[in-house]
């Protein structure tokens, strides 16, 4: 007795290859457009208290471009993470 194998390609769906994300390197990234430096905030500026945060926000708003926001009251808890 002999064996007979018949393959129906129409019945077997080919699995699509997973799409690989294109790797981005430095040459693909251009210069910033419409960039305006309005303020510099260092890590120590935020640890000096909420009054400092308010003054930074006021300084940035005085430079323009921040008029579309809505005022909101925010309460934050400061957690000191000094390495012992």
Curated annotation (Swiss-Prot):
CDC42SE2 is mapped in the genomic region associated with schizophrenia. GO terms for biological process: phagocytosis; regulation of cell shape; regulation of Rho protein signal transduction; regulation of signal transduction. The gene is CDC42SE2. The lineage of its organism: Eukaryota, Metazoa, Chordata, Craniata, Vertebrata. Keywords: Cell membrane, Cell projection, Cell shape, Cytoplasm, Cytoskeleton, Lipoprotein, Membrane, Palmitate, Phagocytosis, Phosphoprotein. This is CDC42 small effector protein 2. One of its GO terms (molecular function) is signaling adaptor activity. PROSITE patterns: CRIB. Gene3D superfamilies: CRIB domain. It is a lipid-anchor. Coiled coil: none annotated.
């Amino acid at each position: 007795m002999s064996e007979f194998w018949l393959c129906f390609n129409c019945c077997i769906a080919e699995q699509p290859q997973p799409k690989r994300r294109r790797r981005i390197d430095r040459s693909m990234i251009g210069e910033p457009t419409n960039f305006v430096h309005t303020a510099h905030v260092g890590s120590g500026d935020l640890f000096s208290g909420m009054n400092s945060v308010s003054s930074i926000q006021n300084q940035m708003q005085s430079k323009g471009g921040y008029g579309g926001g809505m005022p909101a009251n925010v309460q934050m808890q400061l957690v000191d993470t000094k390495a012992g």
